[in-house]
């Protein structure tokens, strides 16, 4: 499959998480003595239940670092929720959501072309240095016990390039890096116990860090 959805990944035992880590890092899976290359593109999406922690297996930092972004999904708007309820409750037996009705919006080749277009976005050294400075600041900031690694800076630039592409630009700007900072870094930092007790969050901490790092002139 080109797209894998690991639902409530923190409920998967360590052995399953390890297998997923191999797939994400090596782009291959090993079954017994055989190794199978994965198709391209290969995209992994995973969900976590932030409320129910009983019976879960916390993901190790090395595996969290393999995920490019962490998105926070809130409740839908009233209009969206009404549509969900109507569609889910419609049809025979109340099963109105028919998987067969899903329309294709892009092909694997389309994704590969989009990835190539992102790679071609220009990133001058000043903007790359800015991304590195933000990541390095997470390692020195008060209230953070574990800061982001080098993969965090790489992901900042990659996601920043995707924002530039979606904005119709052929070059990366500091604003693209700022926009990418929270989704790219929130799962890559660990707050100290003292910070957590005072009500600090990853997002609040990262906003303060981004504000403190001088951005290059555009």
Regions found by a protein language model. Give the residues of each.
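Conserved alpha-helical scaffold flanking the Walker A/P-loop in AAA+ ATPase domains
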Residues: 1-5
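Conserved AAA+ ATPase small/helical "lid" subdomain
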Residues: 96-153
């Amino acid at each position: 499959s080109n797209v894998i959805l690991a639902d409530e990944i923190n409920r998967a035992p360590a052995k399953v998480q390890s297998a997923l880590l191999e797939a994400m890092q090596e782009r291959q899976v090993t079954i017994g003595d055989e190794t199978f290359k994965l198709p391209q593109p290969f995209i992994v999406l995973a969900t976590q239940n932030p409320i129910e922690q009983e019976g879960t297996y916390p993901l190790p930092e090395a595996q969290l670092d393999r995920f490019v972004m962490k998105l926070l999904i809130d409740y839908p708007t009233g209009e969206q929720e009404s549509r969900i309820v109507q569609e889910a409750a419609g049809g025979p037996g109340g099963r109105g959501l028919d998987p067969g009705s899903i329309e294709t919006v892009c092909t694997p080749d389309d994704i590969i072309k989009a990835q190539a277009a992102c790679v071609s976005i220009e990133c001058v050294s000043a903007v790359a240095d800015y991304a590195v400075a933000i990541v390095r600041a997470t390692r020195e900031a008060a209230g953070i016990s574990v800061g982001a690694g080098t993969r965090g800076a790489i992901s900042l630039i990659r996601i920043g390039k995707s924002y530039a592409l979606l904005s119709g630009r052929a070059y990366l700007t500091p604003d693209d890096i700022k926009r990418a900072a929270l989704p790219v870094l929130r799962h890559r930092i660990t707050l100290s116990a003292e910070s957590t007790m005072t009500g600090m969050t990853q997002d609040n901490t990262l906003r303060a860090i981004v504000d403190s790092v001088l951005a290059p002139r555009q």
